[in-house]
């Protein structure tokens, strides 16, 4: 982000008019800050002193989760920085984050009015929108209802317990065949390249009721758009924090808007096709479920806010995003960790062999009997912390936290990485150790420890895709562990240094996989 903004600042200084406007804005911000009245009994937020115009951007380097963690060690779990001309409160520490998002959840339930957010789903995004509480709550309730219908375990059947299980099991089988086929031809494979396509197929099946071949150009186009979106968002948009830059040519922002337009048009086309073929007695997927809601003209029972047909596109767009990049990143990290810790990989396979066997495919109903696998997934979430921050929150009224005054409309960052690596919360936090989530005898999952891991956010803005995420990662991973053994490619050592972006991904690598004796007991 810093590297992007410095050349822009140079171009701004070349124009006297723009310099004057920036100066006026700066003077206004300083005067506003200096005249912010602190209620009696409360304290002013601590934090580093900002520089003119750019604030503390030079101190927030290319790995902001690390630099902000270092600042929290100096200033505490609640402190303020200035990014450009926007004050930002940074929250760290498990207790502080829980206090803000759960106990004082209403105060911190807003979304910051960042400029770029207006272009995500044409400003109708459930996750990014600054809509009033009644509006986003009504749409969130609708989205959660659709997800529960298709993505959660509501009792087993001879076939599949839910649509998610059906889609993942079929796609998992195909992924195993793909990896073994690639191994036969090339002798190694790129885990992210194949996993991301499989995960995209699952969410397409859930949302759109269609499955693509892995070389389908429409599917690959979706995958590429998601990758572009992550790159652009991860690089940051200076106009979010220096308002005057909105009026200057911005190649990155133009690319960001183009990606959103392309994906919105794709989803709009799918939704229109669903309207044409909609059958109330045959709800095929999540899009049909949302249309069914709008056809029945159901109202939010609290706010009486009707969800219009146009909002369906935004909700489907959000659900696709919630069920795609996060899950593919988690699964790709999981395979890399299996290679990095081969003894853990063998323990996981042994657990599956004993509890599920080598004849049938693992199911969602097996999850309760696979505590080590669940612990492994939790430790991947914690150790990699591939979602280092939540989407920025915003205070909806003047409030206080830990004795510090926080004004209304303040942008709030939640440092999930710090919580997941806090030495006060975890023993040897830098060590990868799934056993930290197991009981002393290793037979049960310690759910209280698992609840400390922060990956999907918490409180009123908790990720709506969490149910999909946890179950999908579990099912895919169980199938892969049961069928395949993963190894490092000789001469290609793993580099697990994360690359910062919307989600932190591992460096692309080449791995090896070999079939286990599937279909017969070892």
Curated annotation (Swiss-Prot):
Entry's Gene Ontology BP terms: hormone biosynthetic process; progesterone metabolic process; response to polycyclic arene
PROSITE patterns listed in its UniProt record: CYTOCHROME_P450 (PS00086)
Induction note: By 3-methylcholanthrene (3MC).
Molecular-function annotations in GO: catalytic activity; heme binding; iron ion binding; steroid 17-alpha-monooxygenase activity
Binding-site positions, heme: 463
Protein localization: Endoplasmic reticulum membrane; Microsome membrane
Pfam families: p450
Ligand binding (substrate): 229
PANTHER family: CYTOCHROME P450 1A, STEROID 17-ALPHA-HYDROXYLASE/17,20 LYASE
This protein's UniProt keywords: Endoplasmic reticulum, Heme, Iron, Membrane, Metal-binding, Microsome, Monooxygenase, Oxidoreductase
Membrane topology: Peripheral membrane protein
Family to which this protein belongs: Belongs to the cytochrome P450 family.
Designated gene of the protein: cyp1a3
CDD domains for this protein: CYP1A (cd20676)
Function: Cytochromes P450 are a group of heme-thiolate monooxygenases. They oxidize a variety of structurally unrelated compounds, including steroids, fatty acids, and xenobiotics.
Stored InterPro entries: Cyt_P450 (IPR001128), Cyt_P450_CS (IPR017972), Cyt_P450_E_grp-I (IPR002401), Cyt_P450_E_grp-I_CYP1 (IPR008066), Cyt_P450_sf (IPR036396)
Gene3D superfamilies to which the protein is assigned, alphabetical: Cytochrome P450
Protein name: Cytochrome P450 1A3
Gene Ontology annotations for the cellular component aspect, listed alphabetically: basal plasma membrane; cytoplasm; endoplasmic reticulum membrane; heterochromatin; microvillus membrane; nuclear membrane; perinuclear region of cytoplasm; rough endoplasmic reticulum
Keyword Isomerase attached: no
Originating species: Oncorhynchus mykiss (Rainbow trout)
Protein EC: 1.14.14.1
Cofactor(s), names only, from the UniProt record: heme
Tissue-specificity statement: Liver.
Catalysed conversion reaction: an organic molecule + reduced [NADPH--hemoprotein reductase] + O2 = an alcohol + oxidized [NADPH--hemoprotein reductase] + H2O + H(+)
